[in-house]
Amino acid sequence: MANVKINNISARQILDSRGYPTIEVQITLSNNVFAKASIPSGASVGKFEAVELRDHDTNYYHGYGVTKAVNLINSEIGQKIIKLETLDQEKIDNALIEIDGTNNKSRVGANSILAISLAVAKAAASTLNIPLYQYLGGITAKILPTPLINIINGGMHADNNLDFQEFMIIPHGANSFEDAIRMSSEVFHTLKKILKQKQYNTNVGDEGGFAPNIKDNTEVFDIIIDAIEKSGYKVYKDFSLGLDVAASTFYKNEKYKFSDYQFSTHELVEYYKNIVTQYPIISLEDPIAEEDTLGWKMITKELGDKIQIVGDDLFVTNCKLIKNGIDNNMANAVLIKPNQIGTLTETLNAIRLAQKNNYNVILSHRSGETNDTTISHIAVAVNCGQIKTGSLSRSERLAKYNELLYIEKLLNTSAIYQGML
């Protein structure tokens, strides 16, 4: 398989699940193998994420077009990447970083770079005639992740009055990934019936979860627990709950304002301590704003030995920020979104750093998704044991779950379901 090189790179503009433009790249190799990758985009974006390249022409897709990025891939970037050795992922990714030349990928865009990076990895796996998870993880890749399923959407992911962004069910009591999806589907459909009975709407948000206008967060917990129990399952034993608070979205002037209340950092941490005691919540994502360093230290000290405290906006898949969090005892888990950093190599480095320091790792989608299933393969490749990829509706979310079901079948008796976080 030596000397299989990139022969052609072709990019085009497609639409993501929210109807905004994004990039799809096809890589063709010298052996005529080809592969495609497409890139998601977030609604709730961390301040320190690598930069997407957009057209900013308000007369074209309201400024969200990506024709500049597509043209760069089809010209300057492509010319410098063609003829590179396909199986040397790190060399290709470093070349892409060098072509950009900035510390936040703002010249050619993290979206341009990542589309190429992922397509190269897929083409390399196809060349070796092995699945992507095996190409990236080798024979040790066998853990199917526990899904954190966003069953009710709020915040920036839905047009409703819920302040918290995601209310998740976590099927840690399942015996297999297939079992986890079945159990979660049953709860999802039971929840729909309960919402209808309570005369709440059952429209879905960006990530496929229901988006009812429920004013009180605690009522959401009660309704989800009711759905779990009416589906024949038990909280703590079969399911627990997770929250993506996205606290940066309601943090201003060193105060947190939601549900008609205003909280200091200390008061907010006390609020979390209270709901974690009252409800089966085992994971809190972005419970504190990314710039509230003292708040992160406080909540990790108070709850870090009891539940999973996940940094998303805090870390943005960036090794430097993850190391800072580790050194300062902030959070105990890292959310990984490849488009926050821009290359597969940097993504894998961030995962390794977190795992080496005993931080949990969760692979994650974005609110504006495509049918690309790369994150499913990365999750299994690194044995991270957790994945966030939306609810059990909307095909761009289900594509990832269905790919994991396929991977579980490929692994056969070698497959291990993570279960408890």
Swiss-Prot record:
<feature type="active site" description="Proton donor">
    <location>
        <position position="207"/>
    </location>
</feature>
<feature type="binding site">
    <location>
        <position position="312"/>
    </location>
    <ligand>
        <name>Mg(2+)</name>
    </ligand>
</feature>
<dbReference type="GO" id="GO:0000287">
    <property type="term" value="F:magnesium ion binding"/>
</dbReference>
<dbReference type="Pfam" id="PF00113">
    <property type="entry name" value="Enolase_C"/>
</dbReference>
<keyword id="KW-0324">Glycolysis</keyword>
<keyword id="KW-0460">Magnesium</keyword>
<comment type="similarity">
    <text>Belongs to the enolase family.</text>
</comment>
<feature type="binding site">
    <location>
        <position position="285"/>
    </location>
    <ligand>
        <name>Mg(2+)</name>
    </ligand>
</feature>
<keyword id="KW-0479">Metal-binding</keyword>
<comment type="pathway">
    <text>Carbohydrate degradation; glycolysis; pyruvate from D-glyceraldehyde 3-phosphate: step 4/5.</text>
</comment>
<dbReference type="GO" id="GO:0000015">
    <property type="term" value="C:phosphopyruvate hydratase complex"/>
</dbReference>
<protein>
    <recommendedName>
        <fullName>Enolase</fullName>
        <ecNumber>4.2.1.11</ecNumber>
    </recommendedName>
</protein>
<dbReference type="GO" id="GO:0009986">
    <property type="term" value="C:cell surface"/>
</dbReference>
<feature type="active site" description="Proton acceptor">
    <location>
        <position position="337"/>
    </location>
</feature>
<feature type="binding site">
    <location>
        <position position="388"/>
    </location>
    <ligand>
        <name>(2R)-2-phosphoglycerate</name>
    </ligand>
</feature>
<keyword id="KW-0456">Lyase</keyword>
<dbReference type="InterPro" id="IPR000941">
    <property type="entry name" value="Enolase"/>
</dbReference>
<dbReference type="InterPro" id="IPR020810">
    <property type="entry name" value="Enolase_C"/>
</dbReference>
<feature type="binding site">
    <location>
        <position position="367"/>
    </location>
    <ligand>
        <name>(2R)-2-phosphoglycerate</name>
    </ligand>
</feature>
<dbReference type="GO" id="GO:0005576">
    <property type="term" value="C:extracellular region"/>
</dbReference>
<keyword id="KW-0964">Secreted</keyword>
<feature type="binding site">
    <location>
        <position position="366"/>
    </location>
    <ligand>
        <name>(2R)-2-phosphoglycerate</name>
    </ligand>
</feature>
<dbReference type="InterPro" id="IPR036849">
    <property type="entry name" value="Enolase-like_C_sf"/>
</dbReference>
<dbReference type="Pfam" id="PF03952">
    <property type="entry name" value="Enolase_N"/>
</dbReference>
<dbReference type="InterPro" id="IPR020811">
    <property type="entry name" value="Enolase_N"/>
</dbReference>
<feature type="binding site">
    <location>
        <position position="244"/>
    </location>
    <ligand>
        <name>Mg(2+)</name>
    </ligand>
</feature>
<dbReference type="GO" id="GO:0006096">
    <property type="term" value="P:glycolytic process"/>
</dbReference>
<feature type="binding site">
    <location>
        <position position="165"/>
    </location>
    <ligand>
        <name>(2R)-2-phosphoglycerate</name>
    </ligand>
</feature>
<dbReference type="InterPro" id="IPR020809">
    <property type="entry name" value="Enolase_CS"/>
</dbReference>
<dbReference type="GO" id="GO:0004634">
    <property type="term" value="F:phosphopyruvate hydratase activity"/>
</dbReference>
<dbReference type="InterPro" id="IPR029017">
    <property type="entry name" value="Enolase-like_N"/>
</dbReference>
<comment type="function">
    <text>Catalyzes the reversible conversion of 2-phosphoglycerate (2-PG) into phosphoenolpyruvate (PEP). It is essential for the degradation of carbohydrates via glycolysis.</text>
</comment>
<keyword id="KW-0963">Cytoplasm</keyword>
<feature type="binding site">
    <location>
        <position position="337"/>
    </location>
    <ligand>
        <name>(2R)-2-phosphoglycerate</name>
    </ligand>
</feature>
